Amino acid sequence: MTPTELNLKAKALLETHFDDIVLSGEISKITLHGSGHWYFDLKDERSSIACAMFKGANLKVGFKPAVGNFLELCGSVSLYPESGRYQFIATSMKKAGFGDLEAQFLALKERLQKEGLFDPRFKKSLPKFPKKVGIITSKTSAALQDMLKLIHQKEYFLAKIYIFDALTQGNNAPFSLIRALKKADDMDLDVLIIARGGGSREDLFCFNDENLAREIFKAKTPIISAIGHEIDYVISDFVADFRAPTPSAAIDTLFYSKLDIEQSLDLMEEKLMQLWNYKIQNYENLLLNLSKFFKFNSLPKIIDEKIKQSHNIEKQLNHLLANQMRYNELKLDKLQNAYLQHENFFNKSKKFICIRKNGKIANLEDLKSDDIVILSSQTSQKEAKIL
């Protein structure tokens, strides 16, 4: 029996005995092919199976399935003779709620967000020209080789690269990643990249670990999360200081190429020359204006003008002082005259006599014989009787 004959017999056997199956599970990987066919893996807690839903059948489905969807499929088991790979051929599909992984992811994301672990205020800035860069990933991974190759291509030789080996898949991966992160964070690095290439949802799920997220948040070193592909989002992306869609994108973000640096230096040189020329032109204009000024205003002439100005000011001051003296003399004369007038009046008033009758000042015309009056001067007082 040839492999083809065996595969054909197995295909017939599977299609005969597994032709009306209801299958439930969570999508862990999916490809929506350009032909219109859908190819995806359906998994439970322990196993997964390859599935296909051809265009004629999936046109009746009212939604586009995605990783994390929990589905209920109807269909049959078949075998692809060329490869001997068996798969489930779905004829109908409906959602059965969120899958376990997606539900865990969303619940943790919501909780950490409420705690403030994703708050932009806590994000640390990335260095402009890093000199000590750490990379946490599997030392045997293709992602690491791609990153190192890209650094070499950029000819960025300012930085020393430190590799911290860690598991990036499986149940033990979170512990391994945390251990590598703590070690790297104690080495006073300029920046740290946590990286992993693409994979299925469950392959990347170790980067949704809560303990890992909290270690990333409290790290002293700025951290870039570079996990999977553009469409892959994990908790470490949200809590890190910067999210790169791929490991290679992290290198592009962090490192300038030699050409970029040379072009930047050329641009800076050009701007400095423009600034220098501008300053020189300003100083030349200033010197020109000063030379014109001194040409028409020689130093002796300037000194003569200043002396004349000082003489004029002196004359004005003398004039003001003379006016003030005359004004003060006039005021003094007025005060002296007023004083003399008051003094004369006071001396004359000593000879005046005041006549009072019954406590009131009386005129001579009002007095009669036998009236008793009081005669008062400034120095004495006498009682008298009118005859």
Curated annotation (Swiss-Prot):
It is found in: Cytoplasm. Keywords: Cytoplasm, Exonuclease, Hydrolase, Nuclease. Pfam families: Exonuc_VII_L (PF02601), tRNA_anti_2 (PF13742). Its EC number is 3.1.11.6. Belongs to the XseA family. Heterooligomer composed of large and small subunits. This is Exodeoxyribonuclease 7 large subunit. It comes from Campylobacter jejuni (strain RM1221).
